[in-house]
């Protein structure tokens, strides 16, 4: 059985992965992976160190710690069981969550229909026709990238959604791969688009025998 491999996305500097649980299996000896509080503090301090000689103002490390902790506790609930990454190119910016997972293929559903459904390419609720583009991954092949504007049901604000999807088929195994982002700030999504494209191209499906590499490095 193959598995969703997001390990290579962890090497991209604007991205921080939120562990799936605390502590995460295989990371029991990693101090920052034991609790969300330890994780948030570790990355808050590390991000500011990465931006030296720019110095944080008094309280900014604590503020970023609190922000990261909030995302660690709340973001995974939006799409349970999805891998969650935060795009954070600067410690003074607000994180942008990205969700990644495998989606079971419904029986008889063809590739094009499935990918358009997953990406909301034909969403009737969009305030204007979604921008649908082919998107190639070196690991997953041809897929779709869809950018859409829609009205949030709770706030009535116009939000921006960005989704990517591919179909993976190898032997008897098949699944769809889905990436989801959304934000009320269109500029935040558009500014991050190149980074998100790069992130999307690192996602892959790996064989069982490669699973140990997840915990060994």
Regions found by a protein language model. Name each.
Residues 1-160, 168-176, 181-217:
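N-terminal targeting sequences that direct proteins away from the cytosol to non-cytosolic compartments
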């Amino acid at each position: 059985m193959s598995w969703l491999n997001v390990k290579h996305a962890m090497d991209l500097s604007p991205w921080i992965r939120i562990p799936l649980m605390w502590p995460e299996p295989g990371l029991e000896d990693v101090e920052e992976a034991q609790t969300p509080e330890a994780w948030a503090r570790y990355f808050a301090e590390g991000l500011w160190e990465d931006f030296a000689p720019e110095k944080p103002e008094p309280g900014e490390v604590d503020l970023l710690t609190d922000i990261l902790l909030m995302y660690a506790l709340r973001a995974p609930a939006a799409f349970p069981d999805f891998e969650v990454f935060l795009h954070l190119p600067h410690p003074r910016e607000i994180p942008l969550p990205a969700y990644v997972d495998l989606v079971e293929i419904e029986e008889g559903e063809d590739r094009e229909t499935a990918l358009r459904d997953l990406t909301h390419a034909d969403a009737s609720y969009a305030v204007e026709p979604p921008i649908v583009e082919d998107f190639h991954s070196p690991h997953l092949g041809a897929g779709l990238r869809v950018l859409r504007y829609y009205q949030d049901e709770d706030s009535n604000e116009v939000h921006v959604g960005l989704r990517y999807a591919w179909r993976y088929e190898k032997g008897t195994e098949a699944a769809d791969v889905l990436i989801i982002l959304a934000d009320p700030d269109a500029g935040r999504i558009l500014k991050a688009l190149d980074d998100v494209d790069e992130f999307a191209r690192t996602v892959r499906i790996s064989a069982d025998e490669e699973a140990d590499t997840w915990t060994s490095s």
